[in-house]
Amino acid sequence: MPAASQYLRALEARGLLTCRRVGRRVNYGPTTGTSEGAAGEIVKALRVSFRKAQPIDAIFKLATAFTHPRRIDVYRNVAIGADSFAKLQMTTRIPARALSRHLGKLEARGLVKNEIARYVAATPRHPFARVLASLARR
């Protein structure tokens, strides 16, 4: 099975897409946004995001913020108060170079701020970023 089909099925299984068979083809589309839980929150935020200019670039950049499990762990620890680089390294057990790289990606996406040698969770302005940050904290 092609990778695209597998990804579409995975998104459907999580409630982000619906599929409909039309003859030999299967058409995928966004859900109505009425689903509950994380999928519903994500779909609603994406609908708002697509109304803005240049949505694809912004959504792609934000979606890649939490594509690595360690980055989610780093974000969670920053959100609960592990504010210094040393504290983050101790609580996450991530090597310094990798931790620095993960923090850089989170900073570039507006999810974490570095304020004079301490890290704090930022309040994202983008609706999709807010939903992702909320889900990462869970």
Describe the role of every protein-language-model region.
Residues 21-27, 33, 115-125:
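Short, Lys/Arg-rich nucleic-acid/phosphate-binding segment
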Residues 68, 86, 102:
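Short, thiol/selenol-centered motifs that function as redox-active sites or metal-ligating centers
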Residues 107, 113-114, 119, 124, ...:
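C-terminal regulatory/effector modules of DNA-binding transcriptional regulators
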